[in-house]
Structures are given as C-alpha cells and as structure tokens.
C-alpha cells in the first residue's frame, strides 16, 4: 500500500507542478536562461567543471546546422502526447526566446536522427551527436524508491519482472525461469500460458533481493535507475542505449556487474558475489554515488539549460 501511494504521489506531484505549462500562453511562462545561468557561474569550480563535462556528453554537436522553416518554435509548441515528454521539454523551452526554433523526438529513440534533435534516448555508438539528450519522461525513468534494507539482509537470489516481447528477454526467461538462483518472469497477460509467466511484483518487493537484473527492451531498461540507487546489485549485459543517466559511461565491475549477452555467466556471477559480498557492496556504493549526480534539481536545471544553449548557439538562422 505504501509503495503504491509513494509512486502515485510521485506522479501527482509531477503533473500538478507542470499542468500550467499546457494551459498558459508562452509569453506568461517565459523565464530567463541567462538569469538562471548566472547562478551557475557562481557555483564552485569543481561543480561547474562536472556539469560542463556532462553538457558536452549530452550534446556532442560541434558544427553549425540548419533546421527547416517548418520546425516548431517555442511560442508555437502545442500540447502533445506523451504528456510527460511534453511537460519536461516545455519546462525548459520557456527559458529561451519565443521565436526560437528547435526539433525534438519523443518516445524510444533507437536510431540517430538526420537533423539534431532533443531526445530521451539514443544508441551508444560513435557519431551520435544529432541525438541531443535531455531528461525527458523523467516521471517514469527517474522514479526512485527508498531502500533501507542492507545488501546482506536481502534474499540471495536474482529477481526480474517485466514484459517479455523482445527475443532476448524471451530467451532469458526460457533458460532461467526455473533456476534456483532466480525469481524471474513475464507479467504480461499474453504470456499467461507460458511457463515463465509470473504475477506482478512491486519495486518494494524486488528490493528485498540482493541481485536485480536490468534488461533493455525497446531502448533503455526503466528499472536501471532505481536499481542503481538501491542497496541491491545490478546485473545486466553491456547497455546499447543511453539516456540522461549516461549509461554509456557506466563501467562494468565498477557501477554494475556485466553479463554475457547469452547470460551464460549469470550463475557464476551470482555465486561469486555470494562468496565475496564486500565486492558487491563496493559496486553498490559506486552505483549510488553515480546516481547522486542527478539528485539536485538546481544542478539538473543548469545542466539542461546549458545543453540547450549549446544547441541553439549552433543553430543557423534562416
């Protein structure tokens, strides 16, 4: 009951905070990026350097570019679905001139756009600079549940729940749904007749396990953020997609335990960390520290505004 209320309150706060963005005229919503970034300039040098490093990772553009005349403008950006993407982007666009043009792509972005666009996700690959990352759909992807249970007090199994539509998820479940070290299953109704079908399991219950699997779906795995913020150990194959969390910068053996793409080493990895729990706790500490950089609203705003400022500085006027 507490978890359901916690998640619902998280959503309610987001939509109440942002509802006016879809109702009021853009001119009434306008704020000044320059004024906000003056506060950034007064921040400690070490913090400014860390933020600037993130900015150039999210926005790797280095050459001027054009957008078509049909590209939307800040003053003409009507409400769109999914609304969570719209609200996150609108909350940032309000800091820039009303006539400023931009381009954005909502949803799971798994290819590189032809023209520079603001996106939630992108492939981890070279030459992905046209996919400029922002913290979009944050209400879903940055939902974190408090975990007060120490690693050694948790169940010594690996847990996973989700929808298994993709081949790699199905293959995993076919191989491990009966494994004694695993409590894994597909919760989607379409899998009801499959031997790997399981009932829904809340985040709170999943956090009672020492090991939690993060499996990418169409793009990034939604559970990766809350796993890495918890006292459980994240196991996953090397990520192929990234978001504001900078999954492409995560280091195997430092922030998470990397599995082979065929999961053949899953049992070996679990047994290793059962023998050496201090090694698991060291990785968990690093993961929590990684997640801490996304926790301060002021820092997150400065970072996003600088990402957008760089984008607009390279956009050629018509």
UniProtKB/Swiss-Prot annotation:
Enzyme class, first EC level, given as a word: transferase
Transmembrane segments: none
UniProt keyword terms in alphabetical order: Glycosyltransferase, Lipopolysaccharide biosynthesis, Transferase
Pathway(s) served: Protein modification; protein glycosylation
Superkingdom assignment: Bacteria
The keyword GTP-binding is annotated on this UniProt entry: no
EC number(s) per entry: 2.4.1.-
GO MF, any single term: glycosyltransferase activity
UniProt KW Transport keyword: no
Annotated PANTHER family: KDEL LYS-ASP-GLU-LEU CONTAINING - RELATED (PTHR12203), PROTEIN O-GLUCOSYLTRANSFERASE 1 (PTHR12203:SF35)
Function: Involved in lipopolysaccharide core biosynthesis.
Protein family: Belongs to the glycosyltransferase 90 family.
Protein name: O-glucosyltransferase LpsA
Organism: Dichelobacter nodosus (Bacteroides nodosus)
Taxonomic lineage from the root: Bacteria, Pseudomonadati, Pseudomonadota, Gammaproteobacteria, Cardiobacteriales
Gene: lpsA
């Amino acid at each position: 009951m507490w978890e359901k209320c916690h998640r619902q309150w998280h959503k309610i706060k987001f939509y109440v905070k942002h509802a006016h963005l879809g109702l009021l005229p853009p001119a009434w919503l306008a704020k000044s990026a320059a004024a906000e970034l003056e506060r950034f300039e007064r921040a400690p040098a070490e913090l400014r350097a860390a933020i600037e490093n993130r900015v150039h990772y999210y926005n790797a553009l280095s050459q001027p570019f054009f957008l078509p005349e049909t590209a939307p403008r800040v003053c003409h950006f009507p409400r769109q679905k999914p609304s969570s993407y719209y609200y996150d982007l609108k909350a940032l666009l309000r800091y820039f001139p009303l006539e400023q043009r931009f381009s954005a792509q909502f949803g799971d972005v798994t290819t590189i756009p032809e023209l520079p666009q603001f996106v939630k996700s992108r492939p981890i690959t070279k030459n992905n600079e046209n996919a400029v990352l922002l913290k979009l759909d944050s209400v879903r992807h940055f939902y974190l549940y408090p975990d007060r249970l120490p690693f050694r007090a948790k169940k010594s199994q690996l847990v996973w729940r989700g929808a298994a539509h993709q081949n790699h998820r199905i293959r995993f479940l076919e191989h491990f749904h009966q494994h004694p070290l695993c409590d894994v299953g597909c919760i989607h109704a379409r899998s009801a007749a499959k031997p790997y079908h399981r009932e829904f399991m809340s985040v709170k219950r999943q956090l009672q396990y020492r090991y939690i699997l993060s499996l990418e779906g169409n793009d990034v795995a939604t559970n990766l953020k809350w796993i890495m913020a918890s006292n459980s150990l994240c196991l996953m194959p090397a990520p192929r997609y990234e978001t504001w969390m900078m999954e492409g910068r995560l280091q195997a053996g430092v922030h998470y335990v990397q599995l082979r793409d065929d999961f053949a080493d899953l049992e070996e990895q679990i047994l290793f960390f059962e023998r050496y729990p201090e090694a698991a706790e060291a990785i968990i500490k690093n993961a929590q520290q990684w997640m801490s950089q996304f926790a301060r609203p002021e820092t997150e705003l400065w970072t996003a505004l600088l990402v957008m400022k760089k984008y607009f500085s390279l956009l050629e006027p018509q």
